[in-house]
C-alpha cells in the first residue's frame, strides 16, 4: 500500500483561484500538477498507484473550522463519491486563535478524524509559544496526529521563526505524547547541522515532501538518506509535485528494504489503516 501523508486539494468553486494565488505569491517557483480539485487529485493517485492520501487543509482563520470539518465528514461518509471515501484520509485544521478550539478538537476526535494540520506562518503563531501548548496537549490526549509545516516556506521567504527544528523541539519537550509529523523533511535543510539532532531527540516523524524545493538539495538528499526508517513517511505536497517523480526520488535514495515502511507501513501504523 502506498500512502501520501501530505497532500492538498480544493473545492471546485475556489480551486482555480487558489492555485493561481499560490503561483502568484511564489512568483512562479511553485506550479501545480492538474487543476487542484479533489477529482483531479484522485485521478493522479490512480494513475500513479497511490492508494491513499492524507488531505491537509489549513484554517487561516477560526471561522473556517465548520466548513473544513463538514468537508472531512462528507468525504468519510461517501457524499463526495466512493473513490474519495476509499482513497482520502481527511485531516482537518485547528486555529490557535479560535476561542473554542478545545471544544472543536473534541468534536474532531468524535467524528473519527485522524489528525490535524497546522501551518504556523499562515496561522500566525509559533510552536514555541507556551500559549499554544494547551491546544497541543489536548490533541495528544485525544490521540490525534499532528501534520505541521516545518522550516522555510516560499510564500514567506523572510520567516524562519515559527516552525523550524528548534521550535518543534521546544514544543515536543513541553508536550509529551504528541504524535508530530514535521513536513518537508522536518524543515531541517538550511538550518545548522545540529537541527537534525533536535528532531531525532524529540521523536518527531518527518515526511518526504521536498522534491519541489530546489534550494539545499544536497542537504535534503542527506536527510532523506539518513533518517530512521520507522519515523519517515512518504509525502508529496501534491498538487505541487508530480506523483511518479516523487516516488522515483524517494526510491532512488532509500534502500529497497525501507520502501514498504516508508511508502505505507508507517502511515498505516499512525492512522490505524
Predicted regions and their residues:
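Active-site gating/metal-coordination segments in enzymes
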Residues: 51-52, 60-154, 158-159, 214
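Short beta-strand segments
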Residues: 4, 54-57, 93, 181-184, ...
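Catalytic pocket-lining loop regions of alpha/beta-barrel enzymes
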Residues: 114-115, 128-233
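Mid-to-C-terminal alpha-helical segments outside catalytic/metal-binding sites
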Residues: 1-5, 12-52, 226-233, 241-273
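Short helix-capping segments at alpha-helix termini
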Residues: 78-87, 174-178, 200-203, 227, ...
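Histidine-centered catalytic micro-motifs
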Residues: 2-12, 147-151, 183
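A general structural detector for well-ordered alpha-helical segments in enzyme core domains, enriched
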Residues: 40-44, 68-75, 104-108, 131-135, ...
Amino acid at each position: 500500500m502506498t500512502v501520501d501523508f501530505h497532500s492538498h486539494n480544493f473545492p471546485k468553486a475556489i480551486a482555480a483561484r487558489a492555485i493561481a494565488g499560490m503561483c502568484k505569491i511564489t512568483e512562479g517557483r511553485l506550479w501545480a500538477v492538474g487543476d487542484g480539485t479533489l477529482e483531479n487529485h484522485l485521478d493522479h493517485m490512480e494513475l500513479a498507484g497511490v492508494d491513499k492520501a492524507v488531505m491537509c487543509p489549513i484554517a487561516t482563520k477560526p471561522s473556517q473550522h465548520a466548513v473544513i470539518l463538514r468537508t472531512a465528514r462528507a468525504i468519510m461518509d461517501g457524499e463526495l463519491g466512493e473513490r474519495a471515501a476509499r482513497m482520502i484520509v481527511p485531516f482537518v485544521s485547528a486555529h490557535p486563535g479560535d476561542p473554542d478550539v478545545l471544544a472543536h478538537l473534541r468534536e474532531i476526535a468524535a467524528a473519527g478524524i485522524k489528525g490535524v494540520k497546522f501551518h504556523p506562518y499562515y496561522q500566525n503563531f509559533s510552536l514555541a509559544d507556551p500559549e499554544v501548548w494547551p491546544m497541543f496537549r489536548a490533541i495528544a490526549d485525544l490521540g490525534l496526529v499532528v501534520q505541521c509545516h516545518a522550516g522555510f516556506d516560499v510564500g514567506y521567504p523572510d520567516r524562519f521563526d515559527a516552525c523550524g527544528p528548534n521550535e518543534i523541539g521546544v514544543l515536543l519537550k513541553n508536550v509529551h505524547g504528541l504524535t508530530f509529523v514535521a513536513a518537508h523533511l522536518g524543515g531541517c535543510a538550511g538550518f545548522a547541522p545540529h537541527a537534525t539532532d533536535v528532531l531525532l531527540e524529540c521523536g518527531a516523524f518527518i515526511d518526504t515532501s521536498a522534491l519541489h524545493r530546489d534550494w539545499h538539495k544536497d542537504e535534503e538528499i542527506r536527510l532523506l538518506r539518513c533518517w530512521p526508517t520507522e519515523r519517515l513517511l512518504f509525502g508529496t505536497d501534491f498538487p505541487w509535485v508530480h506523483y511518479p517523480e516523487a516516488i522515483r526520488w524517494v526510491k532512488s535514495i532509500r534502500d529497497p528494504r525501507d520502501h514498504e515502511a516508508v511508502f505505507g507501513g508507517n502511515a498505516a501504523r499512525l492512522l490505524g489503516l
